Amino acid sequence: MNSLSYLNQDQQSFPPPEQALSDPNGLLAVGGDLQPERLLNAYYNGIFPWFNQDDPILWWSPDPRAVFAPGNLRVSRSLIKYLKKQSWTFSINKQFPAVIRGCAAPRAKQEETWISDDIQQAYLSLHQQGHAHSIEVWEDDILIGGLYGLAIGQVFCGESMFHLRTNASKAAMIVLQQHLLRCGFKLIDAQVENPHLDSLGAKSIKRKDFLTLLKHLRDGDVNPDSWLTTEVPIEL
């Protein structure tokens, strides 16, 4: 039987993801901190933090894992028709702080957000170091949606998305996967399956298969200009 590991401030390494609990699914370790080195080590090994505001830091590696292959996003005809009617524009890394704040904002039927001030600061640090990135959706000069995540080699680890207009987060996802495909990325890690991701074509794969893919792709090369701040198109 697997047991939960407890991390201290000086312990940068994680136990193998295969040692994660089955209930709750994927819980691997407790404790540690959110310093950039630890976070990068976690994602490099298929582990991510997820915890509520007043909880200790919890580290996860669930089985199965939700993933996308760039280019395999499921886009319905009705969504394409809807998006063609909009005059939205899209950008990369133009307003990362605003995107993560948008993702952290309370949502309907949700009493609290897991994206605490500490989480926001941690990922802002990763963004400043060139590891965390955002996609923005604009209506004129108003930010109406977006998403953020981390780039680990040829893998993009999606963290969260938000929308203030119908389908704006889906538009951000379309822009992201088209951009990743152009830049040489091979996999989008969506972490935990849910109906929204399933509707977009996410696939659930066994953790061992995900870890095999990750080990193959995490040191791979992509376009070095992938994350320059710029406007990007959407192809419908």
Curated annotation (Swiss-Prot):
A Gene Ontology BP annotation from the UniProt entry: protein catabolic process
Q: What is its EC number?
A: 2.3.2.6
Ranges of Polar residues composition bias in the record: 1-13
Keywords, in A-Z order: Acyltransferase, Cytoplasm, Transferase
Q: Name one GO molecular function term.
A: leucyl-tRNA--protein transferase activity
Main localisation = cytoplasm
Subcellular location, record wording = Cytoplasm
Is-annotated flag, keyword Transcription regulation?
no
Q: Where is this region: Disordered?
A: 1-22
Which InterPro entries does the protein's record reference? Acyl_CoA_acyltransferase (IPR016181), Leu/Phe-tRNA_Trfase (IPR004616), Leu/Phe-tRNA_Trfase_C (IPR042203), Leu/Phe-tRNA_Trfase_N (IPR042221)
Identify the GO cellular component terms for this protein. cytoplasm
Cite the Pfam families for this sequence.
Leu_Phe_trans (PF03588)
Q: Which reaction does it catalyse?
A: N-terminal L-lysyl-[protein] + L-leucyl-tRNA(Leu) = N-terminal L-leucyl-L-lysyl-[protein] + tRNA(Leu) + H(+); N-terminal L-arginyl-[protein] + L-leucyl-tRNA(Leu) = N-terminal L-leucyl-L-arginyl-[protein] + tRNA(Leu) + H(+); L-phenylalanyl-tRNA(Phe) + an N-terminal L-alpha-aminoacyl-[protein] = an N-terminal L-phenylalanyl-L-alpha-aminoacyl-[protein] + tRNA(Phe)
UniProt cross-references to Gene3D superfamilies, sorted A to Z:
Leucyl/phenylalanyl-tRNA-protein transferase, C-terminal domain, Leucyl/phenylalanyl-tRNA-protein transferase, N-terminal domain
Q: Which family does it belong to?
A: Belongs to the L/F-transferase family.
Give the function comment from the record.
Functions in the N-end rule pathway of protein degradation where it conjugates Leu, Phe and, less efficiently, Met from aminoacyl-tRNAs to the N-termini of proteins containing an N-terminal arginine or lysine.
The record's listing under PANTHER family reads: LEUCYL/PHENYLALANYL-TRNA--PROTEIN TRANSFERASE, LEUCYL_PHENYLALANYL-TRNA--PROTEIN TRANSFERASE
Q: Please state what the protein is called.
A: Leucyl/phenylalanyl-tRNA--protein transferase
Protein's gene: aat
